[in-house]
Amino acid sequence: MAGIGFELKKLFRRKGLFATLRAYGYAGVICTGPMLLGVLLQVGMLVLCGWAGAARADQDLLVCMVTYTLLASLTVTSFFSMPVTRFLADMLYEEQEQTILPSFWGSNTLLLVGGCAAYGIFLIFSGATLMQGLLCLWLFAEMIVNWNAMSYLTAVKDYRGILWAFVAAIGISFGLGYLLIFLLGAPVLEGFLFAITVGYGCMMLLETLLLHRYFPQSKESPWTFLRWVDRFLPLAFTGLFTNLGLFAHLVIIWAGPIGIQVKGLFYGAPYHDVPAMLAFLSILITTVNFVVSVEVNFYPKYRAYYSLFNDGGVVGDIV
């Protein structure tokens, strides 16, 4: 978060209403931009489906397939997220950047092999057609790389790079979806699912290019990070169970009395999902205010206090 704080402190030093609005706007875009863009993608695709005259069942199935794929990929990558972040912090501190990019490909390999096998089995019994299943599996593989790349880009504080990668993915998805459905007459469900997959594929390429810009390619072992996973195994399970805690209630609600079976193993709960999305949007202002208060007001005092311990401060200054 230090990268955000540095930019915010520069913006908040400027006086005037426009400067304040710009500072809050920057914090909002950086902190909530990817989440907002994800919501925008879902809502925008539903609007385009409505314009294309798609059946309500196809619209619900598209939302379920994309949601299931995103949540499944996020859950798989959450196991490595915290240990990899610790590995990155140690390597950057020790100035061993040559080990970072190989670890990215090594972690991707393990996540893709295990994740695609598990999600592929789910898709076989999910009731999806062969084309729908292949597109979902393709999107799942891309999102594993995307979530993993975001952990690496966050470590180097390239929040703008992450945001612009999301913007590019959304724009390409909308543009390609419109081209396929309205101009070429492709099937609505498969056309939009393909457009979303291509959009997130472009996002994956952009994030990979950003990583190559920051870190050198080398012949270091791609499995070095596994020592950190073994050493900090509780962190791995913390990340996994935190993610399960965030999203397990969705599965319970989808399988509960208010859930509806969209198709096969794909379930949804419109009476819950829509209010939940609105509730999520309502807390964004609080999230932005929290980030601003922590980075601009709290963090400078926190850093000054602990620097007294690390840099030989006297007792009088500390107390």
Predicted regions and their residues:
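Specific pore-lining/lateral-gate transmembrane helices of multi-pass inner-membrane transport
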Residues: 92-104, 273-319
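Hydrophobic alpha-helical transmembrane segments
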Residues: 165-212
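Membrane-water interface segments that mark the loop-to-transmembrane alpha-helix transition
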Residues: 23-31, 80-120, 315-319
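Transmembrane helical elements of multi-pass membrane transporters/channels
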Residues: 195-295
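Alpha-helical transmembrane segments of multi-pass membrane proteins
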Residues: 67-72, 108-113, 121-153
